[in-house]
A protein has these predicted regions:
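Gly/Thr-rich phosphate-binding beta-strand-loop-beta motif of the actin/hexokinase/Hsp70
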Residues: 1-16
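Histidine-centered active-site/metal-ligand motif
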Residues: 147
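Active-site or metal-binding loop neighborhoods of secreted/extracellular toxin and effector enzymes
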Residues: 154
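Mg2+-dependent endonuclease catalytic cores in nucleic-acid-processing enzymes, primarily RNase H-like
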Residues: 12-143, 160-167
Length: 167
């Protein structure tokens, strides 16, 4: 999951297998919706869920209610585990997550129909080029494509294949 309030929330539905591959079977993204909406989406999809993984910001308490999104989700029947942070600086964390996602992609199988929006976001995810300095910026562009890519980055940071792939 990549949780957004003003931004999109992105959900990747995946299954690991004994060979260490990851099947990305579905993808859902919406904007401006609260957690009750996503609880209904999960119910309507009628999948059997093992784990729901979310970034560390799920533990932030909302000013209005004093409850975290983690607590709200639990009250709706969604049990999240928090993806551990991989680095102390934001740019370092993003970079390490991008590297983890690149390493994971060779193990992924995508449902092309159900994951079309995710695949498009991954194809358009990029860094902005600074023409004055002749270099790419340290962090990726934050636009429509970053939500699905961030969800994959969190998944890649968390996912540990059960069996190494032969070289």
């Amino acid at each position: 999951w990549d949780l957004g309030i003003g931004d999109a929330t992105s959900v990747i539905f995946s299954q690991g297998n004994r060979a260490g591959d990851l099947r990305i079977v579905d993808y859902y993204e919406a904007s401006g919706e609260g957690l009750p909406h996503y609880a209904k989406v999960l119910q309507d999809k009628n999948y059997t869920y093992g784990r729901h993984m979310a970034p560390h910001d799920i533990q932030v308490r909302e000013l209005g209610t004093g409850r975290s999104r983690l607590e709200v989700a639990a009250s709706l029947g969604i049990r999240f585990e928090t993806v551990p942070r991989v680095h102390t600086s934001v740019s370092g964390e993003v970079e390490e997550g991008i590297h983890a996602a690149r390493m994971l992609l060779s193990r992924c199988w995508f449902d092309e129909t159900r994951c079309k929006a995710l695949l498009e976001s991954l194809q358009h995810y990029r860094r902005e080029y600074n023409t004055r300095l002749n270099e790419f910026r340290a962090t990726p562009v934050h636009d429509w494509s970053s939500h699905g890519a961030d969800a994959l980055r969190y998944l890649a940071t968390w996912y540990k294949p059960t069996k190494p792939r032969p070289v």
